[in-house]
Regions:
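A short, flexible beta-alpha/helix-coil linker loop
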Residues: 16-18, 86, 106
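N-terminal strand-loop-strand
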Residues: 1-21
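Active-site segment of metal-dependent pyrophosphate-handling enzymes
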Residues: 45-86
Length: 134
């Protein structure tokens, strides 16, 4: 939160100009929620705790760097995390840059339409959690 307004940490994956949400693979035997916390910590340098599930998206892309090229199908579940501690300069090698954005700016800055939708749902989840605490 900055001045009472929610903020979101977005990443620029290595060698890309895209702004995206952190995500990654679940390790064998790892619960999805723990994977979300771990991947967020690795990719952003920030630690957080799960507030709630936002949604799951499905998409595919062609990995042209593979020979022969292959189509990759992904299913990604996003969770809202509450920031606890950390330093965005401590992100891992998979990421070139991490920045905090006010949530409205994050929605407009996110490169991928499905992730814009996730951010809009996160905004609603944050608002509903704020209402519950009143």
């Amino acid at each position: 939160m900055e001045n009472g307004l929610p903020e979101v940490a977005l990443i620029q994956p290595r060698d890309r100009k895209a702004w995206a949400l952190p995500k990654g693979l679940i390790e064998r035997g790892e619960p999805p929620e723990k994977a979300a916390e771990r991947e967020a910590r690795e990719e952003t340098g920030l630690s957080g705790t799960i507030v709630g599930k936002i949604d799951t998206i499905k998409y595919s892309y062609v990995a042209r760097w593979e020979k022969p090229t292959v189509r990759v199908f992904k299913i990604v579940t996003f969770y809202l995390l509450k920031y606890m501690e950390g330093d965005p300069s401590r992100h891992d090698w998979e990421v070139d840059r991490v920045e905090w954005f006010p949530i409205e700016t994050a929605i407009s800055s996110a490169t991928y339409p499905l992730e814009k939708g996730i951010l809009k749902k996160a905004k609603l989840l944050i608002a509903s959690n704020s209402e519950e605490r009143r």
